[in-house]
């Protein structure tokens, strides 16, 4: 896949990913990942220091599906929705069947009572599996700018 095509494929995948979350279609969220994948939400400080700690960690698409099932059926949390704003993906590298990118994000949280607040800012550090049919996330590290993370981190970022 040519460099421009990879950039466009990643930008489209990013748009579809946040639309899925923002529209509440969480059952489809694991489909953006390869079967063997990593999803991690961490702080910029932990990421910079190479610390393994994470607020959310999953090591496979099955673990992501389990998270969605628990959000739907088991966890008790105040219902809310997200609205993502994304920067353009920056393709760090692309060779063979893999592409690495970074994308800045801002997430607003909308509560049931209608109140809206700035929930998280940061960047996605991604590794994509690249095939002729498109791209899928092999690894997504969500690096939050702040070390102050709200305890209501239920939905995926």
What are these regions (language model features)?
Residues 17-19, 72-79, 112-115:
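Short helix-to-loop capping/linker segments positioned immediately adjacent to catalytic or ligand/cofactor-binding
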